[in-house]
């Protein structure tokens, strides 16, 4: 093992920071799909030699899967990984001269580009393909292995829109995988916002969704095999799913979430409890008391406790004031000197989805849904001060300042955290800044679709709330 021996002699750091493989953790991306896609490519083209290019980070693992399947099919394999660089919507790898010479004019091999995605721009895939074409690789000898198959017309990158349709692509959808077929057999698809038709038949009252960001979910309705309805929602492969299941079981044991029935192929099974999604009109003493207990329970039982990244919050608020309200509003914001308030405050597993429709009224009270995903995804806020959820509940249910202070006081008293109410004004700024940014980007991405219009409406509401929050901050309220 000369390579491992050489590696062992290097001065390695004491710790390494690893990226979460988003597809495996959040988006029901199964390595088996790439095995099947590679097998399909091998059957169709019977390649003699393949250069398998994984795009980092997750493309490293996925390209190894593709390479293994093709090697088993008899192909000679060369593997390498590249990291596309540059502006977010114009990314492409940069090769050192020796590697570029090695790849130049390789007409004897297929070049297979492997990654999850494409994302909004499509530029990682197409930028890599364009690089290879520039090295003399025939376009007809390049194949892409993506995690989904858009037509490319909506890509932000103009070059990606031009190149994507010309390239061969090999993809096997989740629905075609064996365990995908098993999970979906007899189930109703609730993914991509389809759950709204089940719980809110009046389409005019549907809450806004960003379908591209929703996790896969299915409902098994009552039948011979399932006497009671069961919800299956993707929680993550391996340890990611196990951690979500464990926390969901804890919330259910506390009486705040539906019972957990198991974890299978990365999908968590929970009881589908009959109930009605809430609206702002449902705000009342019983709900406020339940929400206060829920927020406190999460803080006391959080599976994570990290150092709060206050600089990120400060930067987010300032950037979104400048972007969302205008640079002149920065003067109203003033100097955000809040560090003393947050000294020794940990970042914990907040809910981060305290919107009314995420609560349901049942025969026995209130339950919180969607409670284990959003402190651990690739959107803001991640693990955060527990007061984030206090601010979220107050903003989304429209609490006035007095009611918000009372709610914060109740949570603070339960946690013996007397400074929590004092942290609420700044976290209200940060919460609304985050929601404004998310809704605005979703509206832009979804365009003239019904959800695009819903997100545009939300953007206006959050902009109004953001202005109010900045004015309250300026006045010291």
Label for each model-derived stretch:
Residues 346-356:
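Catalytic-loop of the protein kinase fold
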Residues 45-50, 107-109, 228, 315, ...:
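A short, charged/proline- and glycine-enriched loop
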Residues 171-174, 361-363, 367-370, 461-474:
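Short, structured interface segments
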Residues 391, 405-476:
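Helix-rich C-terminal or lid/interface subdomains of diverse kinases
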Residues 1-211, 276, 282-283, 303-306:
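PRPP-associated nucleotide enzymes
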Residues 181-200, 327-328, 456-476:
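Non-catalytic membrane-proximal stalk/linker segments that position and tether the catalytic domains
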Residues 112-113, 348-350, 367:
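Residue-level marker for buried hydrophobic side chains located in beta-strands
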Residues 201-334, 356-358, 363-365, 369-433:
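Conserved ATP-binding subdomain of kinase catalytic cores across diverse folds
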């Amino acid at each position: 093992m000369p390579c491992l021996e050489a590696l062992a002699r290097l001065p390695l750091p004491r710790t390494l920071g690893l990226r979460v493989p988003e597809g495996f953790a959040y988006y029901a991306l199964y390595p088996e799909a790439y095995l099947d896609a590679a097998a399909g490519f091998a059957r169709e083209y019977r390649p003699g030699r393949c250069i398998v290019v994984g795009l980092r980070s997750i493309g490293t693992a996925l390209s190894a899967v593709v390479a293994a399947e093709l090697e088993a099919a008899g192909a000679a394999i060369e593997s390498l990984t590249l990291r596309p660089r540059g502006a977010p919507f114009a990314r492409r790898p940069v090769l050192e001269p020796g590697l570029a010479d090695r790849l130049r004019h390789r007409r004897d091999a297929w070049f297979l580009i492997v990654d999850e995605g494409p994302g909004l721009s499509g530029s990682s895939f197409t930028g890599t393909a364009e690089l290879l074409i520039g090295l003399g690789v025939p376009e007809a000898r390049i194949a892409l292995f993506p995690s989904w198959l858009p037509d490319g017309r909506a890509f932000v990158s103009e070059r990606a829109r031009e190149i994507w349709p010309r390239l061969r692509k090999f993809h096997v959808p989740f629905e075609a995988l064996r365990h995908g077929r098993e999970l979906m057999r007899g189930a109703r698809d609730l993914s991509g916002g389809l759950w709204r038709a089940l719980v809110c038949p009046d389409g005019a009252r549907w809450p806004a969704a960003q379908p591209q960001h929703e996790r896969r979910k299915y409902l098994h309705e009552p039948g011979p095999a399932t006497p009671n309805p069961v919800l299956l929602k993707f929680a993550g492969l391996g340890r990611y799913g196990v951690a979500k299941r464990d926390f969901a079981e804890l919330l259910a044991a506390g009486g705040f979430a539906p019972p957990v029935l198991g974890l299978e192929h990365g999908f968590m099974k929970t009881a589908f409890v009959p109930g009605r999604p809430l609206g702002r009109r449902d705000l009342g003493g019983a709900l406020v008391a339940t929400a206060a207990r829920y927020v406190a329970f999460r803080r006391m039982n959080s599976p994570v406790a990290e150092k709060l990244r206050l600089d990120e919050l400060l930067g987010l608020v300032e950037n979104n004031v400048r972007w969302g309200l205008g640079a002149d509003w920065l003067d109203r914001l003033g100097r955000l000197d809040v560090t003393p308030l947050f000294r020794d405050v940990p970042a914990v597993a907040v809910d981060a989805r305290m919107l009314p429709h995420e609560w349901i009224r049942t025969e026995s009270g209130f339950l919180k849904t969607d409670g284990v995903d959003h402190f651990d995804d690739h959107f803001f806020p991640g693990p955060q001060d527990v007061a984030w959820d206090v601010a979220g509940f107050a903003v989304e249910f429209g609490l006035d300042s007095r009611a918000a202070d009372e709610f914060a006081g109740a949570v603070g008293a339960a946690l013996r955290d007397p400074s929590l109410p004092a942290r609420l004004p700044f976290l209200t700024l940060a919460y609304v800044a985050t929601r404004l940014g998310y809704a605005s980007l979703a509206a832009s991405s979804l365009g003239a679709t019904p959800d695009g219009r819903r997100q545009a409406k939300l953007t206006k509401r959050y902009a109004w709330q953001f202005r109010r929050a900045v004015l309250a901050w300026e006045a010291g309220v």
